[in-house]
A protein has these predicted regions:
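Histidine-rich, glycine-flanked metal-binding segment
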Residues: 2-57
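Fold-independent oxyanion-binding glycine-rich loops
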Residues: 8-9, 14-15, 49-50, 57, ...
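Divalent metal-coordination and catalytic microenvironments
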Residues: 9, 27, 51, 62, ...
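Residues at the N-termini of beta-strands
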Residues: 31, 90, 121, 151-154
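Metal-associated gating/positioning segment near the N- to mid-region
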Residues: 52-117
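Divalent metal-binding segments
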Residues: 64-73, 89-104, 123-135, 158-169, ...
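A glycine-rich helix N-cap at a beta->alpha junction
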Residues: 112-128
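Histidine/acidic residue-rich metal-binding segments in metalloenzymes
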Residues: 134-294
């Protein structure tokens, strides 16, 4: 990457927004000058960003690019291009591919593919099953001997059935995973037992409202509480994916934090734009495009 000076940009910094200059040298930010005034050397490309905002590249912590197995939906190249076009410069991809990515070998193959196809930074979760803890340990290590393999960002656990065949609902299996692995565990938090029971309530229905009634807020909250309990008992790093309800957010208040202490559970979560802007009242207008688990 050539050296670049961006001048007169409205720069979004951690705690404020200021107009100024930003200098990139050898592909890295070298200087940020509120108010401007950076003088570029002759070889440096200069961009006048007056009236424009300058933000850090965004990180999308949950994408489903369906590569390998279903490239007709999206693949690593098209997905990363779409990300880059929207200002997302890093993504973390999920393991419910065809086949599911549940072994270290499959992760190495996926990383090799990404090295040739992706136009952005990337990371991949290895999928947990009820019987693959040894493969998880190969990918992320154990609490006493953590491993950091470039391209592997953590373990994904589906606590409730969703797209694909990955499911870990058994309490003993969950305890084994939380107790015997290192790194980050990210969970799809829906309670499988409650979903099985509530599915009877919507039998025969084909309306979209049935989906939200079946996979309700309480279904998510039960699994969230369960995952946090395992994390706190083992001191594991935990990320609750796609938080969907106010009751979950209220319950997690005081539990989640940006920073964690060594050896203690560190819990984080995320909210997706669609969960902040749509609800069941929008289904009649937009239909199945709003269907998502949870």
């Amino acid at each position: 990457m050539s050296d670049l000076l961006i001048q007169n940009a409205t720069m979004v910094l951690p705690h404020t927004t200021v107009v100024g200059d930003l200098l990139i040298v050898n592909g890295q930010i070298s200087s940020i000058q509120p108010g401007g005034g950076i003088v570029a050397e002759e070889h440096v490309q200069t961009v006048d960003a007056t009236g424009l905002h300058l933000l850090p590249g965004m990180i999308d912590p949950q994408v489903h690019f369906r590569d390998p197995g279903q490239p007709e939906k999206e693949d690593l190249y098209t997905g990363s291009c779409a990300a880059a076009s929207g200002g997302v410069t890093s993504f973390l991809d999920m393991p419910n591919n065809v086949p599911s990515q549940t072994t270290l070998q499959s992760m190495h193959e996926k990383i090799a593919t990404a090295n040739h196809r992706c136009v952005t930074n990337f990371g991949f979760f290895i999928g947990a099953t009820e019987t693959n803890v040894e493969e998880l340990q190969k990918a992320v290590g154990t609490p006493d001997a953590p491993i950091a393999i470039p391209g592997i960002c953590g373990i994904k656990i589906f606590m409730g059935s969703s797209t694909g065949t990955l499911l870990v609902n058994d309490s003993d299996a969950l305890e084994v995973i939380f107790t015997n692995t290192a790194g980050l565990i990210a969970v799809h938090a829906e309670d499988e037992d409650r979903m099985i029971e509530r599915e009877k309530m919507i039998e025969g229905r084909t309306d979209m409202a049935a989906h939200a009634e079946w996979r309700d807020d309480e279904t998510a909250l039960i699994a969230t509480k369960r995952a946090v309990a395992y994390a706190q008992a083992t001191g594991h790093r935990l990320h609750i994916l796609h938080l969907t309800s106010g009751i979950e957010a209220d319950w997690l208040n005081g539990i989640t934090s940006m920073y964690g202490q060594e050896g203690e559970a560190h819990v984080t979560t995320e909210a997706l734009p669609q969960h902040l802007t749509y609800d069941e009242r929008d289904v009649e207008r937009l239909g199945t495009r709003l269907k998502m688990n949870p």
